[in-house]
């Protein structure tokens, strides 16, 4: 009997240990599954945010491996080569920690403490929250590692000095996560956070001083150095301000690159194709709310031709332009300049044609262009290049004509303007 009791006691003990171990194992499995689920959610969020930040757009060479860097960015201060941000341990960021990544994104410093140049827009990315930064890092660490060493940047003297860069940062860089405007709605603040931070709109749509620093943060427009394109003001209805646009049309422009009265070309077309088309409906709506709210700044008014005092030579100048327009442009854009909505953009009343800088219009005539291929506009109509057909003088005549016909009023364009527009990114 004693042996039986001992046997039963041992059996109960074994069963208790077994069930206890099973309970611990189950708890561990649940915890591990929960961790995997959390990690998956973080990576998915990071993938979305990396797209909104257009990380791949810069950190991928033309025809190269995604995120492996090697793209050359030509600026007034030298040629910068983007870095490999895949998790390769030798040539990428495989040995980086979350803290290292945060230091780069928020403080503009590399893992080794080296100061980074603002061609990497940490001046805007500093507004990104730590939670979002960690999510982007988790996504980048989930990518396949690519072993790719990239050439060093070729920065002109004296801009290659870390001491001078430190001085530049003291004068022009203010770090800090986005602070919500409590007088605005949650939706407005979300749009502002995306546009000012990850979207880094101000990196292009701003006027810069001789040291390359943004002169304001109100998206008043400016020429994009090294690209030879003009990023129009987003706060002026004379350029690309959206204060009088319906929200749905702004959303359509962000996500498809095309509306009945407008389309994106050049660098902005690439941003829509690579980044903005992937905005969630909620975030696109929020960004539209923010962009629509920007105050009007109509200081960049182009001086048009005064037809009441126009000389015979000026009249002949525009008449010659009209003849060239009829021959090369009228088939698509029409005699009335109204084009075909959503297909061939209207030139009559088109702000991109009449804004102070004629640069984008000149480049479009020279090099042609297509709106971005997007989910909402999978087969865009395009315009052929005329650089091989028209002389600079003829391009100037056509652009001057369309800037001063059908009620348009803007300054005339010369062959010198056309010559200066050559080069840069098409």
Task: Give the location of each predicted region.
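Aromatic- and charge-enriched surface segment that lines or borders ligand/interaction sites
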Residues: 93-105, 109, 113, 135, ...
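C-terminal structural cap/anchor segments
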Residues: 320-363
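Extended, polar beta-sheet/loop recognition surfaces of beta-rich domains
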Residues: 247, 257, 348-393
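Short cysteine clusters
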Residues: 55-58, 201-204, 329-332
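Mature N-terminal segment immediately following signal peptide/propeptide cleavage
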Residues: 39-60
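Bacterial N-terminal signal peptides
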Residues: 8-21
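Flexible coil segments in periplasmic/lumen-exposed cytochrome c-class electron-transfer proteins
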Residues: 28-41, 60-79, 111-192, 196-197, ...
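Positively charged n-region of N-terminal signal peptides that target proteins for export
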Residues: 1-4
């Amino acid at each position: 009997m004693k042996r039986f009791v001992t046997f039963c006691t041992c059996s109960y003990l074994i069963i208790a240990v077994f069930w206890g171990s099973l309970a611990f194992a189950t708890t561990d499995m649940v915890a591990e599954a929960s961790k995997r689920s959390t990690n998956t959610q973080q990576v998915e969020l990071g993938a979305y945010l990396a797209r909104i930040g257009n990380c791949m757009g810069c950190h991928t060479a033309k025809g190269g491996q995604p995120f492996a860097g090697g793209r050359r960015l030509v600026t007034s201060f030298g040629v910068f080569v983007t870095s490999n941000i895949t998790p390769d341990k030798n040539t990428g960021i495989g040995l980086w920690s979350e803290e290292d990544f945060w230091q780069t994104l928020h403080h503009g410093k590399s893992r080794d403490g080296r100061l980074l140049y603002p061609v990497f827009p940490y001046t805007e990315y500093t507004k990104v929250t730590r939670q979002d930064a960690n999510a982007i890092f988790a996504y980048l660490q989930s990518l396949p590692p690519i072993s790719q060493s990239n050439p060093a940047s070729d920065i002109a003297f004296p801009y290659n000095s870390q001491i001078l860069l430190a001085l530049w940062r003291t004068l022009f860089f203010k770090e800090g996560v986005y602070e919500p405007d409590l007088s605005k709605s949650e939706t407005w603040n979300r749009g502002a956070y995306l546009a000012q931070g990850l979207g880094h709109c101000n990196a292009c749509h701003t006027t810069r001083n001789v040291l390359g620093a943004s002169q304001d943060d109100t998206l008043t427009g400016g020429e994009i150095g090294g690209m030879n394109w003009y990023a129009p003001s987003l706060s002026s209805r004379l350029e690309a301000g959206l204060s009088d646009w319906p929200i749905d049309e702004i959303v359509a422009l962000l996500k498809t690159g095309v509306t009945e009265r407008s389309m994106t070309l050049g660098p902005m077309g690439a941003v829509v194709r690579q980044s903005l088309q992937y905005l969630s409906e909620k975030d696109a709506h929020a960004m539209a709310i923010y962009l629509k709210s920007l105050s009007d700044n109509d200081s960049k008014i182009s001086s048009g031709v005064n037809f009441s005092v126009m000389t015979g030579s000026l009249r002949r100048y525009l008449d010659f332009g009209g003849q060239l327009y009829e021959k090369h442009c009228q088939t698509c854009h029409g005699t009335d300049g109204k084009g075909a909505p959503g297909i061939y953009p209207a030139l009559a009343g088109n702000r991109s044609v009449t804004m102070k800088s004629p640069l984008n219009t000149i480049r479009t005539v020279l090099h042609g262009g297509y709106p971005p291929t997007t989910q909402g506009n999978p087969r865009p109509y395009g315009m052929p290049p005329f650089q091989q057909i028209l002389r600079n003088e003829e391009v100037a005549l056509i652009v001057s004509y369309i800037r001063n016909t059908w009620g348009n009023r803007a300054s005339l364009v010369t062959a010198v303007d056309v010559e200066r527009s050559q080069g840069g990114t098409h």
